[in-house]
């Protein structure tokens, strides 16, 4: 870097014009520009608050009758007395999802299981066995609280969990 600066100085000495020095000298001699003052107003902050994301999802409104036209149904007020509990998602839906991997492996996933997940697995197998004619293939992950079932049974399992009171 020092060599390039030296060459540039020599070039400027030969031609009589020094390059790059004028801007540096100007920037060092001038003070900071005078910016206009600002006024802090709290009246318009309501418009800023509308843009900020909500910190939590609000509770769903009360309806006259259930299920609602969208098919949503609240959980039973006293939770069912079972050794396991399936917590609702943050949007207040039952956490049963379809999953497809490797292009054709169809799975149904029940998430947010708390408590005895093995009891839930046994109850799910008892529920799905008459529908399939055989015991479904399941996978339990105790750490993440998920139960995976081979095949698409999301609608049946959602209805079954609603019937149980989750």
From Swiss-Prot:
InterPro entries linked to this entry: Ribosomal_mL49
Major localization listed first in the record, in broad terms: mitochondrion
Pfam families, per the entry: Img2
One GO term (biological process): mitochondrial translation
Mitochondrion listed as a keyword: yes
GO cellular component: mitochondrial inner membrane; mitochondrial large ribosomal subunit; mitochondrial ribosome; mitochondrion
Gene Ontology molecular function terms on file: structural constituent of ribosome
Subcellular location: Mitochondrion
Tissue: Ubiquitous.
UniProt keyword terms in alphabetical order: Mitochondrion, Ribonucleoprotein, Ribosomal protein
Keyword Mitochondrion on entry: yes
Region (Disordered): 56-78
Subunit field text: Component of the mitochondrial large ribosomal subunit (mt-LSU). Mature mammalian 55S mitochondrial ribosomes consist of a small (28S) and a large (39S) subunit. The 28S small subunit contains a 12S ribosomal RNA (12S mt-rRNA) and 30 different proteins. The 39S large subunit contains a 16S rRNA (16S mt-rRNA), a copy of mitochondrial valine transfer RNA (mt-tRNA(Val)), which plays an integral structural role, and 52 different proteins. Interacts with OXA1L.
Protein family according to the UniProt entry: Belongs to the mitochondrion-specific ribosomal protein mL49 family.
Stated name of the protein: Large ribosomal subunit protein mL49
Source organism per UniProt: Homo sapiens
Organism ancestry: Eukaryota, Metazoa, Chordata, Craniata, Vertebrata
Gene (UniProt): MRPL49
């Amino acid at each position: 870097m020092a060599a390039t600066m030296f060459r540039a100085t020599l070039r400027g000495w030969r031609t009589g014009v020094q390059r790059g020095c004028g801007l540096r000298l100007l920037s060092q001699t001038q003070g900071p520009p005078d910016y206009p003052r600002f006024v802090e107003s709290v009246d318009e902050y309501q418009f800023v608050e509308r843009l900020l994301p909500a910190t939590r999802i609000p509770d769903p409104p009360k309806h006259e009758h259930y299920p609602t036209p969208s098919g949503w149904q609240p959980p039973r007020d006293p939770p069912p007395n079972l050794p396991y509990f399936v917590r609702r998602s943050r949007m207040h839906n039952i956490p049963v999802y379809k999953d497809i991997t490797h292009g054709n492996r169809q799975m149904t996933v029940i998430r947010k299981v708390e408590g005895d997940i093995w009891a839930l697995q046994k109850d799910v197998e008892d529920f799905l066995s008459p529908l399939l004619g055989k015991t479904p293939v399941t996978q339990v992950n105790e750490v993440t609280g998920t139960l995976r079932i081979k095949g698409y049974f999301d609608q049946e399992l959602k209805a079954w969990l609603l019937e149980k009171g989750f």
